[in-house]
A protein has these predicted regions:
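C-terminal alpha-helical cap of glycosyltransferases
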Residues: 118-147
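Catalytic binding pocket for nucleotide-activated donors in carbohydrate/polymer assembly enzymes
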Residues: 6, 15-115
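Receiver (REC) domain switch-region micro-motif
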Residues: 12
Length: 147
């Protein structure tokens, strides 16, 4: 349901105090741009959506530029980014035009190559962690597992 509803939204405004988590991933999977403000550096719940967004964006200059436009550094930036993106969006018939439409296309097309949605890599890494944990247990070793 989230994904279907997110498709009709032009921009998802994240809450700075406690960010979207699973909903952020669903919104980004739909291609809808997400604007976030990681207000508190010491609160993981305030930084979550920025991390999810970075994982959904493509590597390279286009993804880096999009991150600068969608991750605000202050409340003033958050408001300015939201207003700027909203005012820049126009519809020609039913077709959206503007930076917000470009960001939607970028996110939608990045789904198949982004780190966030790379399920095969995630499963491979998890299986590797299980193998390492088993080997350490058999040897009587403990400790962390680094992948």
């Amino acid at each position: 349901m989230h994904i279907s509803r997110a498709r009709v939204c032009d921009l998802f405004l994240d809450t700075p105090e406690c960010n979207a988590h699973t909903t952020a991933a669903d919104v980004l999977w739909s291609g809808t741009p997400l604007l976030t403000l990681p207000r508190y550096k010491y609160k993981m719940c305030s930084r979550m959506a920025a991390s999810i967004l970075k994982g959904a964006l493509p590597k390279g200059p286009a993804g880096e530029q999009a991150a600068k436009e969608l991750i605000a550094g202050s409340e003033e930036d958050y408001e300015a980014f939201a207003v700027g993106l909203g005012k820049g969006l126009k519809y020609v018939g039913h077709r959206p035009v503007g930076r917000l439409a470009e960001l939607r296309k970028l996110l939608y097309e990045a789904r198949w190559n982004s780190a966030l949605f790379d399920t095969r890599r995630w499963v491979r890494d998890l299986e590797q962690a299980y193998d390492i944990a088993w080997e350490k247990w058999v040897k009587g070793e403990g400790g962390d597992i680094d992948l």
